[in-house]
Amino acid sequence: MVLAGLLLLLTLLAGAHLLWGRWKLRNLHLPPLVPGFLHLLQPNLPIHLLSLTQKLGPVYRLRLGLQEVVVLNSKRTIEEAMIRKWVDFAGRPQIPSYKLVSQRCQDISLGDYSLLWKAHKKLTRSALLLGTRSSMEPWVDQLTQEFCERMRVQAGAPVTIQKEFSLLTCSIICYLTFGNKEDTLVHAFHDCVQDLMKTWDHWSIQILDMVPFLRFFPNPGLWRLKQAIENRDHMVEKQLTRHKESMVAGQWRDMTDYMLQGVGRQRVEEGPGQLLEGHVHMSVVDLFIGGTETTASTLSWAVAFLLHHPEIQRRLQEELDRELGPGASCSRVTYKDRARLPLLNATIAEVLRLRPVVPLALPHRTTRPSSIFGYDIPEGMVVIPNLQGAHLDETVWEQPHEFRPDRFLEPGANPSALAFGCGARVCLGESLARLELFVVLLRLLQAFTLLPPPVGALPSLQPDPYCGVNLKVQPFQVRLQPRGVEAGAWESASAQ
């Protein structure tokens, strides 16, 4: 009886909230509204949202549970909001799971826009670009070459490449963040991030974000998420303590040293509050969540596409041999020299266009009344950029669903993609991610030819339907044939 009464009360409150919201917006010229909730059942939501533009245009509203949101489906509207009117759209909604995962939105990716948020972002960006500038690129290259040596030992055997890429990117983040690439630490943080993301993506958590009052009811998934967060925070705090006990003022060994010392000297320009150690804690969390699985997923998509397009792989290897020397050369190439490898750059751009890791960018919130595409957008409205939809817009891209890296080699023929977002909320680790994609694919294609196991068993190019907010390739395996070895001899050796 009590439960029934509580449900009735919560339903009435939700209905009253909805009616009040509609009354406040009655005089505004709002984007058209998609009726019903069937869009929530679509297996590929970004593509479905793009299809709605044929009737509704590139900007419209829909309901995600009790929350009404505005969806942007074109490069033009996304750039209008996120670049030209970036202050209006720089906020972040206070979603229940976001607050839980980010220590009440104390991190950069999920934190709301404020002067304190700007100071936090500035400190972390400085650590990425200044604190490790001298060591970032050489270490990415060294860790990648060590990865290739491990793969050479397994040459001939089918390899689950997604996991290998995930461990590689985690080792890079571990070294840049903690100055430590020991296997035990890398595997511990890798497993921690995997567990956290799997739990966070579960439907039992996603439903709480759409219907927040359900958090008052028993939810085993919510308990598991809290346990994963507690484990994550314990591991990060242990590393912060180790750094505080051993660091030397005015010197930094890694990003954590830089940020801990930066907290002591950086002040917010005006207003209450200042950066605390908790902000460094959440910067570390951001680096692991945003810098491991995302880059590993893009690398996995690149391998999958190259298995489907061996002619592109052959041209890439010819380009590498021509510019850097034949086979598994160790010739030094820096990221500044990337203009020498236009096809490699175009291939990376095409993978990012077709398979942006987060196809629906994290939701934004308007900080004040604004407009997009001639429509009124009230203050506090949640806005979701459909990045994948913008990348598949037939009015912008010729044959948008085709994997065709050469489109980026045609002068002035194609605009840049928005895989890392844009404006104030652009991905903080974009420069590191692009460096990793460039170095890893370069070294991998220098050392190996990618082959499916067995012949003809190609990976699916349809996203994993159980991957949550990230766009992941379905599990697959690949054989890595060392270059410079005759195919027949290699096949005989690998069969023994």
Curated annotation (Swiss-Prot):
Catalytic activity: progesterone + reduced [NADPH--hemoprotein reductase] + O2 = 21-hydroxyprogesterone + oxidized [NADPH--hemoprotein reductase] + H2O + H(+); 17alpha-hydroxyprogesterone + reduced [NADPH--hemoprotein reductase] + O2 = 11-deoxycortisol + oxidized [NADPH--hemoprotein reductase] + H2O + H(+)
Cellular localization per UniProt: Endoplasmic reticulum membrane; Microsome membrane
Binding sites annotated in the UniProt record for progesterone: R232
CDD domains per the UniProt record, alphabetical: CYP21
Main location: endoplasmic reticulum
Binding residue positions for heme b: S109, H364, R425, C427
Ligand binding (17alpha-hydroxyprogesterone): R232
Membrane topology: Peripheral membrane protein
GO CC terms in record: endoplasmic reticulum membrane
MF annotations from Gene Ontology: 17-hydroxyprogesterone 21-hydroxylase activity; heme binding; iron ion binding; progesterone 21-hydroxylase activity; steroid 21-monooxygenase activity; steroid binding; steroid hydroxylase activity
Record keywords: Endoplasmic reticulum, Heme, Iron, Lipid metabolism, Lipid-binding, Membrane, Metal-binding, Microsome, Monooxygenase, Oxidoreductase, Steroid-binding, Steroidogenesis
Cofactors, names only: heme b
GO biological process: glucocorticoid biosynthetic process; steroid biosynthetic process; steroid metabolic process
Keyword Oxidoreductase (UniProt): yes
Entry annotated with the keyword Zinc-finger: no
Enzyme Commission (EC) number: 1.14.14.16
Gene3D superfamilies attached to this UniProt entry: Cytochrome P450
SUPFAM superfamilies xref list: Cytochrome P450 (SSF48264)
Domain-level remarks: The leucine-rich hydrophobic amino acid N-terminal region probably helps to anchor the protein to the microsomal membrane.
Function description: A cytochrome P450 monooxygenase that plays a major role in adrenal steroidogenesis. Mechanistically, uses molecular oxygen inserting one oxygen atom into a substrate, and reducing the second into a water molecule, with two electrons provided by NADPH via cytochrome P450 reductase (CPR; NADPH-ferrihemoprotein reductase).
Family indicated by similarity: Belongs to the cytochrome P450 family.
PANTHER family in the record: STEROID 17-ALPHA-HYDROXYLASE/17,20 LYASE, STEROID 21-HYDROXYLASE ISOFORM X1
Identification of the protein by name: Steroid 21-hydroxylase
